[in-house]
Curated annotation (Swiss-Prot):
NCBIfam families: PRK12311.1, rpsB_bact. One of its GO terms (biological process) is translation. This is Small ribosomal subunit protein uS2. It comes from Methylobacterium sp. (strain 4-46). The gene is rpsB. Belongs to the universal ribosomal protein uS2 family. PANTHER family: 30S RIBOSOMAL PROTEIN S2 PROKARYOTIC AND ORGANELLAR (PTHR12534), SMALL RIBOSOMAL SUBUNIT PROTEIN US2M (PTHR12534:SF0). GO terms for molecular function: structural constituent of ribosome. InterPro entries: Ribosomal_uS2 (IPR001865), Ribosomal_uS2_bac/mit/plastid (IPR005706), Ribosomal_uS2_CS (IPR018130), Ribosomal_uS2_flav_dom_sf (IPR023591). HAMAP family: Ribosomal_uS2_B (MF_00291_B). Pfam families: Ribosomal_S2 (PF00318).
């Protein structure tokens, strides 16, 4: 794959060149303004094009290194497209009110996310033992938490880059990112302050069609990063546009693993779940998309070693996938292929 391509004509047709009324401008945007028409500032798209390419490259590079990108757009015309774009590129989003401390107080936010998971589990089980009123209250709590945290509940930690629509509205998010040294790529209109933005993309941040174009390009850049990152590991990316529950591989410096034909029967110990690891457990975070939380989930289910995953038959995959609610990740992310490669590498060492 490669970075998504776009043209100045696409930006023009989407209305990306229309700024705000000239009396509502921020003087710091003067270098990006082409002129004025009918008392409306016109943005210089000759600067927008290379700036947007730079932002796309930053997104792709961040994801290729195993980083997370957080889409931030809480205004009405951006909310839906921000969520859709983040989901299809396996990234994260905030499209409702930004909660203070989302980045700078991640520990507290994580507690709220755990509460959301607990409520989800209770309601998924039918709310047994609860009264009708208690179930209703839990359902309302879930809706409230899902609206605020649904886009980041699987993020697993602070993001590595923010993509922001409307820097005026999302000032709090930008301040938190700046405090933590997290780079920010943002669509900056003529009434905005470009200071503190790592990748300034001068463009209209109000037109729905323009916002859809920006988000689509950023999503495709993230997908390109996933392809590059997994390609560097010698992996088949499979359905790379599916969201992942944990972070992407954090270490791209692992030696490239050989491909294994999983259609061949596995020669080794048969698959079984263990009450405890046999010796030291294997580092399951080397598997694509597996982070500490998912390792704990696998351990709780009785999976500690590569050989267990390598020995899985289709019926084992289906059972474990269903019990742990992995949404097809064992097959999609190639865990069996990777586990067999690690087992063979250990045997050859």
């Amino acid at each position: 794959m490669a970075l998504p391509d776009f043209s100045m004509r696409q930006l023009l047709e989407a209305g990306a060149h229309f700024g705000h009324q000239s009396h509502r401008w921020n003087p710091k945007m003067q270098p990006f303004i082409f002129g004025t028409r009918n008392n409306i500032h016109i943005i210089d798209l000759a600067q927008t094009v290379p700036a947007l390419y730079q932002a796309l490259q930053a997104v792709s590079d961040t994801v290729a290194k195993g980083g997370r990108v957080l889409f931030v757009g809480t205004k009405r015309q951006a909310a839906d497209v921000v969520a859709d774009s983040a989901r299809r590129s396996a990234q994260y989003f905030v499209n409702s009110r930004w909660l203070g401390g989302t980045l700078t107080n991640w520990k507290t936010i994580s507690g709220s996310i755990q509460r959301l998971r607990k409520v989800d589990e209770v309601l998924a089980g039918g709310g047994q033992g609860l009264t009708k009123k208690e179930r209703l209250m839990l359902s309302r709590e879930k809706d409230k938490l899902e609206k605020a945290l649904g886009g980041i509940k699987d993020m697993g930690g602070v993001p590595d880059l923010l993509f922001v629509i409307d820097t005026n509205k999302e000032q709090l998010a930008i301040k938190e990112a700046k405090r933590l040294g997290i780079p920010v790529a943002a669509i900056v209109d003529t009434n905005c302050d470009p200071d503190g933005i790592t990748y300034v993309v001068p463009a209209n941040d109000d037109a729905g069609r323009a916002i859809a174009l920006y988000c689509d390009l950023i999503a495709r850049a993230a997908i390109d990063g996933i392809s590059r990152g997994q390609g560097a590991l010698g992996l088949d990316i499979g359905a790379s546009e599916e969201p992942v529950a944990e972070e992407l591989p954090a270490n791209l410096n692992e030696p490239e693993v050989a491909q294994v034909d999983i259609s061949e029967p596995y020669v080794g110990e048969p698959f079984e779940l263990l009450a405890a690891p046999r010796g030291a457990p294997d580092d399951l975070t080397k598997l694509t998309g597996v982070g500490p939380q998912l390792v704990q989930k696998l351990n709780d289910a009785g999976i500690y070693h590569y050989w267990q995953i390598a020995a899985m038959a289709p019926e084992d995959v289906a059972k474990v996938d269903a019990e742990l609610k992995l949404n097809g990740r064992i097959a999609r992310d190639g865990w069996i292929n990777q586990a067999r490669a690690f087992v063979e590498a250990a045997a050859a060492a």
